[in-house]
A protein has these predicted regions:
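Divalent metal-dependent phosphate-bond-processing catalytic cores, especially two-metal-ion Mg2+/Mn2+ enzymes
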Residues: 19-24, 30-41, 58, 109-199
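Divalent metal-dependent catalytic cores for phosphoryl transfer on phosphate-bearing substrates
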Residues: 47-149, 161
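Acidic/His-rich, divalent-metal-binding segments that scaffold phosphate/diphosphate chemistry
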Residues: 1-68
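Conserved active-site and cofactor/substrate-binding residues in soluble primary-metabolism enzymes
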Residues: 5, 9, 25-29, 71, ...
Length: 199
């Protein structure tokens, strides 16, 4: 399967199991951050970038149907195995959830953990900006909101911090990196300011 087909198959898998628009947008956001990380930390090959992107895209594909700790990401892992996804992809997805006990050893596994919560948090920060735009988000605004425990309560701040540490990068640098990775897909995420103009 070539890289375009593989990405299309991953998108179809996501949409088959995930109806929520916000979960689909989260998947796209993590995919964008993972592709950027692959260019920075991976081999630099298009195949590598595609694989890292797919991991980001489908890391939570089973969550809407099976949100419990007993099921997610285990149910998804079974489906991925049935559909022929590699051990490398499946292991990375299992490793993004602390409670699975699967250690994060490869750069791809570490990147998924480092991007998952942060991508969601950056999106939440953009949504409260007057223009609902990623262009209004910077590292300072993200760090400020991280201190506000009432804001985006479900996002684990410790995971964001630990993720950057595991990658061996400064937290502010990682936040800025992910903001930049998300900007090209801002229209797909509804974070290009058009939502504010329409409202």
């Amino acid at each position: 399967m070539n890289k375009i087909d593989a990405r299309e198959a991953a998108w179809q898998l996501l949409t088959e199991f995930t109806q929520s628009e916000s979960l689909r947008k989260h998947a796209l956001a993590v995919e964008a951050c993972m592709r950027a990380c692959a260019r920075k930390l991976g081999s630099g090959s298009p195949e590598d970038e595609n694989q890292w992107g797919i991991v980001g895209l489908i890391h939570d594909f089973d969550y809407e149907r099976w949100p419990s700790l007993e099921d997610h990401p285990y149910k998804g892992n079974e489906i991925l195995k049935e559909r022929g996804y590699s051990d490398e992809i499946r292991r990375a997805i299992l490793s993004h959830a602390e409670y699975t006990g699967v250690t994060r050893d490869s750069p791809m596994e570490k990147a998924l953990f480092a991007c998952d919560e942060l991508a969601g948090f950056i999106t939440a920060v953009a949504l409260i900006k007057p223009g609902k735009s990623l262009a209004e988000v910077d590292t300072k605004s993200v760090r400020k909101r991280m201190k506000d425990k009432a804001f985006a309560r479900k996002v684990n701040r410790d995971d964001i911090i630990q993720g950057a540490t595991a990658l061996g990068v400064d937290l502010d640098e990682h936040i800025a990196f992910c903001i930049e990775a998300l900007k090209p897909i801002a229209p797909q995420l509804g974070l290009d300011g058009s939502a504010a103009k329409a409202g």
